[in-house]
Amino acid sequence: MMSFSQPDAFSPSQFTSSQNAAADSTTPSKSRGASSTMPLTVKQISEAQQSGITGEKGAPFVVDGVETANVRLVGLVSGKTERNTDVSFTIDDGTGRLDFIRWVNDGADSAETAAVQNGMYVSVIGSLKGLQERKRATAFAIRPVTDYNEVTLHFIQCVRMHLENTKSQIGSPAKTYSAMGSSSSNGFSEMTTPTSVKSNPAPVLSVTNGSKTDLNTEVLNVFREPANVESEHGVHIDEIVKRFRLPEAKIKVAIDYLADIGHIYSTIDESHYKSAFNE
């Protein structure tokens, strides 16, 4: 299901060495709770250890001491095969290759997979399944990369998360980490990485008591409301604008940021978004 060859395309040696260090120090017993959507490389996934009893079916995988719920990869598509009920493809990110399957349930799924072709850079959000040496990945969101700075940004996010999580293992209490490795009580309270490939500052929302609340978190909380999680098509941008009574441009900045880091993804069009982490 997985192969871990080392192709010539962008192979960051420094990052590879840091991953090897992480693999040596990470064991299932160091798990600190599941992260939401973790930016990872294929090499990190290949070295991930399964938590719980060895060989236990359904046990989550652990990377740098953190259980993975959903993962995000960026890489080149190859071997795309279309069937009536699913589309399979391979992602090559320069550190290895990982096979994915994307189930096709409706027209929106078909349109999403049709936009992806062999030789194209894509961003994929999915989950890991299987046992220790037989990992497989199921994709539930895939989109083409239109700005190639996103490839570099993804690797920066992987490095940052690796450093944050491995550093926290030394003499610190157990924590739950957000997708970018910042400690938080709910996994989402801090998002301090670059807001996009253009490195715009994260928008903030001034509330009535004079304090400033991270607008990204406020918008994300709307997507995570039970009714919106259950909605087939997610939430329209206009609904977010009405909720916060802020300029549409400001809301779009927050939504673009959340989509860039994998917390939400577009559904039927570029105006509808849904949480990538459903509780």
UniProtKB/Swiss-Prot annotation:
GO molecular function: single-stranded DNA binding; telomeric DNA binding
Segments for region (Disordered): 1-39, 181-210
Compositional bias per record (Polar residues), positions renumbered to this chain: 190-199
Induction: Repressed by sucrose starvation. Induced by gamma irradiation.
Tissue expression remark: Expressed in root tips, roots, shoot apical meristem (SAM), young leaves, flag leaves and ears, and at lower levels in mature leaves.
Record's function text: Component of the replication protein A complex (RPA) required for DNA recombination, repair and replication. The activity of RPA is mediated by single-stranded DNA binding and protein interactions.
Protein name: Replication protein A 32 kDa subunit A
Organism of derivation: Oryza sativa subsp. japonica
Gene (UniProt): RPA2A
